[in-house]
């Protein structure tokens, strides 16, 4: 008799546990458009760090590397172009820089003065990103023709 009570109890518990329960509906306000919050506000740019730690007394001196005096750059840093390797998985790289009016100027070369390389992936889309300052809002527009 005790065995049958235990078996019937287990069967009843299994039936209760396996019966489906209707989920709560999502409140309509949870999926409606919302106003911008505090986290959506673009804040001003933070000052950049000086990673080279140049002394003011060394600024503009010839360092003996054959590059001469560089008064605009501290400590004799190399001011040459930024020659990029082909980081694209397909297609050819090209250099893009901002024109200051919200647009971009692109050139079909790998010798860049800027550090962002875009890839022409034969009518596909691939983005190769170099050094981007994420202290400012970054917008990537992809226009489908």
From Swiss-Prot:
Domain of life: Eukaryota
Transmembrane annotation, as ranges: none
Record's signal peptide: 1-18
Keywords: Cell wall, Disulfide bond, Glycoprotein, Secreted, Signal
Keyword ATP-binding: no
Cellular compartments annotated: Secreted; Secreted, Cell wall
Main location as per UniProt: secreted
S-S bonds: 88-118, 95-112, 96-106, 119-128
Result of knocking out the encoding gene: Does not affect mycoparasitic activity but alters wettability and severely impairs root attachment and colonization.
Induction profile: Expression is detected in planta up to 5 days after root inoculation. Constitutively expressed at low levels in mycelia in young cultures but gene expression is not detected in sporulating hyphae or in non-germinating spores. Carbon limitation stimulates expression whereas nitrogen or phosphate starvation down-regulate expression.
Glycosylated sites: 108
Functional note: Aerial growth, conidiation, and dispersal of filamentous fungi in the environment rely upon a capability of their secreting small amphipathic proteins called hydrophobins (HPBs) with low sequence identity. Class I can self-assemble into an outermost layer of rodlet bundles on aerial cell surfaces, conferring cellular hydrophobicity that supports fungal growth, development and dispersal; whereas Class II form highly ordered films at water-air interfaces through intermolecular interactions but contribute nothing to the rodlet structure.
Family note: Belongs to the fungal hydrophobin family.
Subunit structure: Self-assembles to form functional amyloid fibrils called rodlets. Self-assembly into fibrillar rodlets occurs spontaneously at hydrophobic:hydrophilic interfaces and the rodlets further associate laterally to form amphipathic monolayers.
Protein name per its UniProtKB record: Class I hydrophobin 1
Species, as recorded: Trichoderma asperellum (Filamentous fungus)
Lineage, uppermost ranks: Eukaryota, Fungi, Dikarya, Ascomycota, Pezizomycotina
Gene field: Hyd1
């Amino acid at each position: 008799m005790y065995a049958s009570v235990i078996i019937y109890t287990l069967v009843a518990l299994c039936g209760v546990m396996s019966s489906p329960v209707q989920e709560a509906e999502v409140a309509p306000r949870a999926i409606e458009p919302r106003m911008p919050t505090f986290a959506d506000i673009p804040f001003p740019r933070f000052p950049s760090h000086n990673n080279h730690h140049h002394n003011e007394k060394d600024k503009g001196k010839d360092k003996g590397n054959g590059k001469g005096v560089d008064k605009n750059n501290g400590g004799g840093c190399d001011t040459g172009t930024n020659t990029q390797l082909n980081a694209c998985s397909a297609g050819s790289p090209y250099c893009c820089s901002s024109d200051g009016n919200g647009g971009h100027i692109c050139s079909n070369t790998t010798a860049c003065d800027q550090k962002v390389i875009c890839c022409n992936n034969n009518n596909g889309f691939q983005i190769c990103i170099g050094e981007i300052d994420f202290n400012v809002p970054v917008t990537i527009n992809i226009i489908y023709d």
